Structure formats: C-alpha cells, structure tokens
Amino acid sequence: MKVLVLNCGSSSVKYKLLEMPKGDVLAQGGVEKLGLPGSFLKLTMPNGEKVVLEKDMPEHTIAVEFILSVLKDDKYGCIKSYEEIDAVGHRLVHGGEKFSNSVEITPEVIAKVEECIPLAPLHNPANLKGVVAIEKLLPGIRQVGVFDTAFFQTMPEHVYRYALPYDMCNKHGVRRYGFHGTSHRYVSARACEILGLDYDKTRIITAHIGNGASIAAIKNGKALDVSLGMTPVEGLMMGTRSGDVDPGVLTFLMEAEGLQAAGISELINKKSGVLGVSGVSSDLREIEDAIKNGNERATLAMTMYDYRIKKYVGAYAAAMGGVDVLVFTGGVGENQYTTREKVCTDMEFMGIVFDSKVNEGMRGKEMVISKPESKVTVIVVPTDEEYMIASDTMTILK
C-alpha cells in the first residue's frame, strides 16, 4: 500500500511517499517559500542526492499538483500512474477536544477541524488547504487526518486545566492541549519495541527537543502530561519561544514597552528563547560555536535551555511515581550529545546511570546511552512522524 503523507504549512508543503506496512520511503521532499517570490521544490533522490526545482507556486493546490507531477516524472519520480497512490495521510495540527484519534477525512471532519481554527489560526487553515488540493487533484482517493493534539486527550482534567476562572475557560476552550503528539507517540512505542517492554505497563518520559520542544509523561500507554499547553509556547525554552514565563511579566512589559497583544505574541514566539537570551541565533549549532569563542550570553542561553529540560524530567518522574525509560528525540535530542549529558548528569538519585562515552559518539540513530546497571534506560530514538501518519492511514483504511 502506497501512502502519500502531506504536511502543509502556511508557506511550505512537506511530503513523503511510503510503501506500507514496511515503511520504505519511496520519495520525499518539500515545497518552500510557497506564495512568495522564488518558490521551489527540494527533493531527495534515492541515492541521497538533493535536487532543487524552481517553480512559481502562489498557493497550495499548485504546490501539491507540482509535487504529484514530480512523483510521476521520468527523471525524478517513482510511480507511473497516480492510481498507484492508495491513500493520503495529512498532519493536522489542532483537533481541540473534538478528536482523540486519527480519522478518515469526511465533510463532517473538515467542518470540525474548521471549528478548531481559532485555536490554531496559522496551522489549521494551511493543513486543510492540503486536503482540498488532494480532493481536487486526486478525486475519490481516501484521506486520513492525524492530529498533533489527539495523543494528549487522555490527560486528566487536573492536568489539562489552567487555574483560571472555570466558566471563562469553558466558554473559550482554554485548556492545555499539547503538541508534537505524533512524535511522542511514535518514539515512546518504538523505545518499548526496541527494549522489549510492555508499552501498557511502562512509565516513559519523552523529550522531543528541536527548534520547538516539548516533554511528555506517558504512563501505561497513555499520555499523562506534556509541557506544551494551549499554544506551543508553554514549557521548555525553545529556539525563539520563551517557554514558561510569569504572566505578570507580560502585563508589565505591555505597559513598560507600550505593547499590544500582537506585540506580546511576537515577543514570546519569535524574539525570545535561545535567540532572545543569546542575541546570537536560535540555532544551537551556532550557539555552540559562540560558546567556543567565549560568548557569555550564548553560554547562559545553553545553560538555561538544558536546565529547563532537566527540571521537567524530574517533575514528570515525580508525577508518574518514577520512570522506566527516558527517550531523547528531535533535531537536538537526536544529535546534540552535550544537551543529553547535561540533562542526565547527577541524576543517579532518580535511577539514571549515564554512559558518557557511548553518548558522545551517538548522532541520529537508535541507541541506548545509559549503562547496563541503570534502573532507568536512557535511549535515543529518531522520530518518524511521517511513518506514524502513514501507519495510522493504513490501519484506518484497512
């Protein structure tokens, strides 16, 4: 079964064509600068070669049409007919309280996703444009929606509620939803598969650490807690997002700096985090270079970044009454050994006995990085959200 996975953003469309159930990647790439001058499609050939194809793509339907044409292209493609594509799976960011599982997309589902647009005004409309494009270009093909938020619908009310007026929160749908759910679901299940553990009887902390970042507590197969809240700003310090901050600071800055709501939103989403503290970059590779050159603010930013992760790991271990497995994933979690080491150092009281030597040589592959005597297994699992979306698509449509 060939499943095309689409992740449509406001100015990008990422795609992957997978042969299921094996999960073999037949084609992958993405459109960038969608709707802007100089838009292009960047694809990865089977031999690993990167190819850039420039084309004016003012909107999503044209972008998806170009992706489909490249999939069938004699030089760059891997299929002879669109009929070889059996189904399309979409990343849908926000399902609110309406979706606790992945679903086949119907007009009723689209209407419910549209009702969630106020919760994700940038993401949901773009996600739906991908659905509409496929309906137009591949009429009759079945489509499945996989929600970032669905995995966290198992969080109990005392976890997802904010300590704000009860009726006001209900009126506006204000609560913690969590994000990166597809990634947390994949790496937690995959870690148990690698380690031979029963997923439904294991306490797992998953750290999805990239430019956006979140930590989740998963107990006996269900999400108990996650650091991201109603929006992807709560929790950990991120590339440009602040993470946890005293709300009183924001009202203070509104008055002190003359900021309106839009200005505060830009401040905490785009000007804070590692970039805001360091003044250098949101990219941790550039931060590490700055640290080597003696930049004190870069050092401070990195120390804050690692400390926040460590603090959440301890909190979630307490929330679950202990932890059996700690998983690192995401661009930083998979590739930056220094952050993993800082998080796991001096954690013997919690049962973590870290293997620094194994950790230092580990980048981007599945590997246990704790010592055999460690009560908590620390493991790196590269995330594969596209495989998870394709897997859900296959399961639902079969």
UniProtKB/Swiss-Prot annotation:
Pathway annotation from the record: Metabolic intermediate biosynthesis; acetyl-CoA biosynthesis; acetyl-CoA from acetate: step 1/2
Chain sites annotated for binding substrate: 91
GO cellular component, one term: cytoplasm
InterPro entries per the UniProt record, alphabetical: Ac/propionate_kinase, Aliphatic_acid_kin_short-chain, Aliphatic_acid_kinase_CS, ATPase_NBD
Site (Transition state stabilizer): 180, 241
Names of the cofactor(s): Mg(2+); Mn(2+)
Catalytic activity: acetate + ATP = acetyl phosphate + ADP
Binding site for Mg(2+): 7, 385
GO molecular function: acetate kinase activity; ATP binding; magnesium ion binding
Keyword vocabulary terms for this entry: ATP-binding, Cytoplasm, Kinase, Magnesium, Metal-binding, Nucleotide-binding, Transferase
Cofactor mode of binding and number, as noted: Mg(2+). Can also accept Mn(2+).
Annotated compartments: Cytoplasm
Residues noted as binding ATP in the record, renumbered to the chain: 14, 208-212, 283-285, 331-335
Top EC group: transferase
Any one GO biological process: acetate metabolic process
Primary location recorded for the protein, binned into one broad class: cytoplasm
Catalytic activity, EC: 2.7.2.1
Active site: residue positions: 148 (proton donor/acceptor)
Quaternary structure and interacting proteins, as annotated: Homodimer.
NCBIfam families noted in UniProt: ackA
Protein role: Catalyzes the formation of acetyl phosphate from acetate and ATP. Can also catalyze the reverse reaction.
UniProt similarity note: Belongs to the acetokinase family.
PANTHER family: ACETATE KINASE, ACETATE KINASE-RELATED
Record protein name field: Acetate kinase
Encoding gene, per UniProt annotation: ackA
